């Protein structure tokens, strides 16, 4: 009896293990930010998209295909020409993600590596078409407008293939060596012209100052001559007295200066009898 009991327990355990293995092989998980499409060996890709969570499928008949639907970055370098035939090196940074409802169509037409098949194709096409409408200088001064136009046209093209572009930006923009040298030479010429203009303006200011100074001297001379004509020697005597007063004031402020009156008895003020 005991042997039969344990034999049954073993058989039940084996059955449970087999059943657990079968059930486990029929389960699959869809993580957050992902979606799944089911490939059936008899009917092909099913139209319904499976959301996040744990789901059942028929082993050996069905196969889940997982897609990441979160935004992913990609850089697309492009070499193209501007409207004035200048070589332009541009790097386009794109944030993209698939449209969940379009995943069965995306897998059927493009496969899981849809981004590798589509973005390197449509990004250069759109970018070259837009850049060809601008001169090299406009690409610098109107960079935001160029980026907006590329974003609009590229978004429309990407939607045709079943995915969304969340952000598009021009992260790198350089020109050929010839254009770079031309820009540098233009900047040097502008600096030299600015310097020359400053020198000319300075000379004009100096010339104007000299003219004003000469006019002032001439006017002062005229007034002085008029004063001499009206006052005669009195004005000269007044100026002499003013100059003498100024000299006396300056000497009075100096130390060690003695004042000697005019005359013969200037030393110690001695009487004349002693001198005899």
UniProtKB/Swiss-Prot annotation:
Cross-referenced InterPro entries: Band_7, Band_7/SPFH_dom_sf, Prohibitin
Keyword Calcium: no
Alphabetical list of Gene3D superfamilies matching this protein: Band 7 domain (3.30.479.30)
Gene Ontology biological process terms, A to Z: cellular response to hypoxia; mitochondrion organization
Record flagged with keyword Ubl conjugation: no
Keywords: Developmental protein
GO cellular component, as recorded: mitochondrial inner membrane; mitochondrial prohibitin complex; mitochondrion
Source organism superkingdom: Eukaryota
Function: Required for larval metabolism or for the progression of the larva into a pupa.
Sequence similarity: Belongs to the prohibitin family.
Protein name in the entry: Prohibitin 1
Originating species: Drosophila melanogaster (Fruit fly)
